[in-house]
Amino acid sequence: TGQKMWISNAGFAKLFIVFARIEDDKNITGFIVPNESNNGITLGDEEKKLGIHSSSTRQVFFNETKVPVENMLSRRGSGFKIAVNSLNVGRIKLAAACLDAQKRVTSYAVQYASERIQFNTKIIDFEAIKEKVAIMATDTYVGESATYRAAKDIEDRIKIRHDSGNSFQESELKGVEEYAIECSLLKVAISEDMQNIADEGIQVFGGMGFSAETPMESAWRDCRIGRIYEGTNEINRMLSVGMLIKKAMKGHIDFINPATKVADELMGIPSFEVPDLTELFAQEKLILTNLKKIFLMLAGAGIKKFGDKLEEHQQMLLAVSDILIEIYMTESALLRTEKNCNRLGKETQTNQIAMTQLYLYKAVDIIQSKGKEVIVSFSSGDEQKGLLMGLKRFTKYYEYPNVIELKNIIAEKLKEENKYCF
């Protein structure tokens, strides 16, 4: 007996997966419940939503609904674990779904900009529009790189567990669970990229973008739920850092030793030698390594300062999570682009190289901003000066990329193909 809100597909579902508490059990249990009106099940009216109008969303009311014991999903009291794992799967699936929408919206924007003429010039030839479509494409490429990476990691982990004698079901559960952090990071990054891309798509369309007759209006409304689905982005941000710290505390990953090495490095004299940057991505790899040091520096200092009460400092966790997101997304794009350069030849990957370099440049800006925010929040005096100097050292470029040129390169390829083409 009870009610559930915001149930997707409730209007036509034949079966419900319901999580409920049996009597005074501490933990919840999962059930398979047929949607039968003669068994105490009634539905509320269809919700009037901001977006996703074609989906059915209703309340479900249970009034002394009888559920046979054989309809229990797994074991009694194991519902929370099932629910959490379904969220992990849902998060990476949401990321993949958003990516398809990002590609379509980017293509719509490029096609409209190639047709719309202002001052006797197609607006795709204006640098203000080139910048927009280049960033839209870059965020899509990077998000896709990270999603493929996580999906392959999960697939490999499932196979390893299955080959070791685990059942396929157990292998899937554990495989996804081991990459729960990555699933959360992807969900946050890509749902927010989707929102930004839809917003910029409207801007490219101008006044027409505000019309319900163009595809941008529904894209903007429909994508807003992505930041709320499968746990809000704020919850997922804090979860990702929290899970990482818990893994370190349990000894599942070595976090303390690398953090200590970074702290020791900060105490030493920095090298002023200019490294050899002739090899492809030499500078990008060096910067990426240093960005990881920033995360270790800040998370290590936070743990040292607050211990197990770090979770209470939510703004700090949110900022550190943003740093973690940028590191994972940047590394994913770099790995993909480098692999394809080696496989297909560097000359075939000009635009992908440009997108990787452009994204890293943006990531460094974000990490500098978030890093300062975190450092100033919990430190003072010499400690603060040391951490800020470390942040400056670890975000150093030896040769700054020409980001305007990078954006123009990407935009010209989009114009040539008249769609998202990467």
Please name every model-derived segment.
Residues G11-A13, D25-K26, S55-T57, L87, ...:
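Short, solvent-exposed loop/turn segments at the edges of secondary structure
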Residues T42-E144, S184, I225-Y229, N233-M238, ...:
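Glycine-rich beta->alpha junctions and the first turn(s) of the following alpha-helix
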Residues I197, M208-F281, S379-F422:
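Glycine-rich phosphate/cofactor-binding loops in nucleotide/flavin-utilizing enzymes
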Residues Q3-T42:
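A short core secondary-structure module
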Residues Y141-A189, I202-Q203, G307, M329-Y361, ...:
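C-terminal helix-coil-helix/basic helical segment that borders enzyme active sites and/or dimer interfaces
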Residues I22-N27, K103, S107, Q111-I124, ...:
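Secondary-structure transition/capping motifs at alpha-helix termini
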Residues I129-E177, E182, A189-S191, M208-K250:
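Acidic/histidine-rich catalytic neighborhood
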Residues Q3-M5, N9-G11, V110, S114, ...:
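Active-site beta-strand/loop segments that form the cofactor-binding cradle
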